[in-house]
């Protein structure tokens, strides 16, 4: 989920395993030769997308594809499927039963049959990032659409790099004041670096960072117990992944840095009816992922 957001960076890492698998045998090993998918078990620790730190273990379906003009990454999560801490609500304990994020990009070069490359910019896309949290009531629902321009960069190095810049339209946002309006921008950086062969698999380093700014949330009238703004107009989430990929199995360790995670002000003093607490929206969290490609 957004709470994991291995997101599109995992696309490139998984592609290495599919390529390796294809070389091993001419028999098809996967259900599709272009729609690549996996089922994952994800354990998260100290994620900071809400006002309270969250730990949980959940089930995830993940898919990516790149065919002609279509570039896709997406996942669907069943939150807290295998349990979590007291603040983690999900499918079995009256929380959201489903969280989804998709990142479709459509090649402008290929759709217009025009070579728009120049300098290090290889290809241009109409880029999208849509996030949906089903929830069970208004306080658990999110629907956010980022839309804008994306590009792939030729670095001249054995790595891949892509950049996307978006404007954001916010529908539901857990009851926040910025619902049903245009509200800010996002700049996304994603990169992939193959490292080495290890234990019969392929070890890679993957990174992606979301820079969010320009939101109205930091100016609303939601104040903490000390009279300070409880929300912010900006946030950063920066993920750093070591991924070990095989033909079918893959394993990842993720370190993620949050700054104003979920646009919550760090150290804000709040009380939602279960006692006072301090928001810890800035700091490190982590994930461990085990998945099967099919």
UniProtKB/Swiss-Prot annotation:
The organism's place on the tree of life at top rank: Bacteria
Topological type in the membrane: Multi-pass membrane protein
Leader sequence residues: 1-22
Swiss-Prot/TrEMBL GO biological process terms: monoatomic ion transport
SUPFAM superfamilies according to UniProt: Tsx-like channel
A GO CC annotation given for this chain: pore complex
Keywords from the UniProt entry: Cell outer membrane, Ion transport, Membrane, Porin, Signal, Transmembrane, Transmembrane beta strand, Transport
Keyword flag Signal: yes
Entry-linked Gene3D superfamilies: Nucleoside-specific channel-forming protein, Tsx-like (2.40.230.20)
InterPro entries per the UniProt record, alphabetical: Channel_Tsx (IPR003055), Channel_Tsx-like (IPR018013), Channel_Tsx-like_sf (IPR036777)
An MF annotation (GO) of this entry: porin activity
Cellular location(s): Cell outer membrane
Broad class of where this protein is predominantly found: membrane
NCBIfam families: PRK15106.1 (NF011686)
Family as reported in the entry's similarity comment: Belongs to the nucleoside-specific channel-forming outer membrane porin (Tsx) (TC 1.B.10) family.
Function as written in the Swiss-Prot or TrEMBL entry: Functions as a substrate-specific channel for nucleosides and deoxynucleosides. Also functions in albicidin uptake and as receptor for colicin K. Also is a receptor for several Tsx-specific bacteriophages.
Protein name: Nucleoside-specific channel-forming protein Tsx
